[in-house]
Amino acid sequence: MVVSVKVFKKATPNGKVTFYLGRRDFIDHLDYCDPVDGVIVVEPEYLKNRKVFGQLATTYRYGREEDEVMGVKFSKELILSRDEIVPMTNPNMEMTPMQEKLVRKLGSNAHPFTFHFPPNSPSSVTLQQEGDDNGKPLGVEYTIRAFVGDSEDDRQHKRSMVSLVIKKLQYAPLNRGQRLPSSLVSKGFTFSNGKISLEVTLDREIYYHGEKTAATVQVSNNSKKSVKSIKCFIVQHTEITMVNAQFSKHVAQLETKEGCPITPGANLTKTFYLIPLAANNKDRHGIALDGHLKDEDVNLASSTMVQEGKNTGDACGIVISYSVRIKLNCGTLGGEMQTDVPFKLLQPAPGTIEKKRSNAMKKMKSIEQHRNVKGYYQDDDDNIVFEDFAKMRMNNVNMAD
């Protein structure tokens, strides 16, 4: 069986400069981050003694584009890294195996490049827009771009500039640990003796995207009130650090009266299962995603991870966390009682069985979707599959990027 390697490509409008990237997702391992490595091909007669410059940039949009009036901007663009790609400033640069293969295949006009994310740079996050909002979405987005000019300060012309969006993501640690998060609360009532105790325990601390969360609920009713119903939620908590804004959204929920009412002196132990999925929140404004909802492989935004010894308060960009929330309805006069149990929602780490299964499913979908798509072709000599860099759609492929 021959294993092909997919390579993404994108050219300038005039077709004179072409980007080649071996991947679109780059992983933050907390102690280091994958470098952005690729190859750029430029026609030498087009340069005419000019140079090709590259940039790694991030755009942090924290307000709606339509609200930008009187010169007020609700976005920041930062150039994280820049370099002169052609001619190379470091001819002894160590190339990755993918770069070596591409340079060998594409010839003398191919030039490798490498950019690095700075420490503590935020992960890619997109906040889902409202249906009638056609502006740029809120969130953190990374772009790799190249342009032709005499110097880095030259005005960038669209016809000779190529840019493509990449993602910076985080993976779960290889070991998910043995800790079982739990919470215990109790509630008393005015003019009534006794309390209702609620204990919630999760079966693990780290869940992968698409996995069931199992919450075991134990209710002990030592009061004179009755529990009428139980509500379960998975809550996504979002913090936009630039404007110090925080909000929460339910990404999965259920309500049940099974085992209810829980009368005075009675107990109940029951396990509830919920699956938080981006596909079930297509029309929910403000839901945080790790890409755009129209992408075929989009997930809910992963929990923000920080290095050991630091807390999420030190993180920048958009900070994401999750919790399971259980609410008990204690009647009209008794009100509600609730508790939250935090957990982490992450991508499975490379090398794990879950990651291999996920990659296999994505590969099957990709082969099926792109089998007859123009711009997707294979070079049998080096087992390289070239694909025009474009957004992958859920139901079709739009190659007009």
UniProtKB/Swiss-Prot annotation:
One of its GO terms (molecular function) is G protein-coupled receptor binding. SMART domains: Arrestin_C. GO terms for biological process: G protein-coupled receptor internalization; signal transduction; visual perception. Keywords: Phosphoprotein, Sensory transduction, Vision. InterPro entries: Arrestin, Arrestin-like_C, Arrestin-like_N, Arrestin_C-like, Arrestin_CS, Arrestin_N, Ig_E-set. SUPFAM superfamilies: E set domains. Gene3D superfamilies: 2.60.40.640, 2.60.40.840. Inner and outer segments, and the inner plexiform regions of the retina. Undergoes light-induced phosphorylation, probably plays an important role in the photoreceptor transduction. This is Phosrestin-1. The lineage of its organism: Eukaryota, Metazoa, Ecdysozoa, Arthropoda, Hexapoda. The gene is Arr2.
